[in-house]
Amino acid sequence: MGHHLRNLRRNKRKLYLCQKYIENGKDFFQEPVLIHENYLPTNSEGDLISIGMDYPMYLRMKPEISEKDLFHEGDRFYIFVEPPTVHDKICKNADYEIYKKPMIHIDSMEVMLKRRSGVRSDN
């Protein structure tokens, strides 16, 4: 296995994905699922920015194309915060959300996350 691949895999970080579903016209979220992905901070245009910010407003994730059915606009994530021990069906403390439809290309995909307003990190 190439050195490059090993590095990529090692850099993946853990986060929890909560898929959105609608019940009686209201948004709810499935139980958090632990996944491992790479993500990088960007500006609102999706251009990479330096890692200076602790809690970036936007993150770009490039999952494997085989994972394309996992991600949907409106899904929420716990990234810099842990999910609660008892599942919260509205994920009110989830710190990020997919804010536009994931872009799917032939052999890659891109998912844009936006920090949810009103959610603060501890520090």
Identify the meaning behind each predicted range.
Residues 1-26:
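Active-site-proximal polar cores
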Residues 21-123:
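Short, conserved turn/kink motifs that form compact alpha/beta structural patches or helix kinks used as
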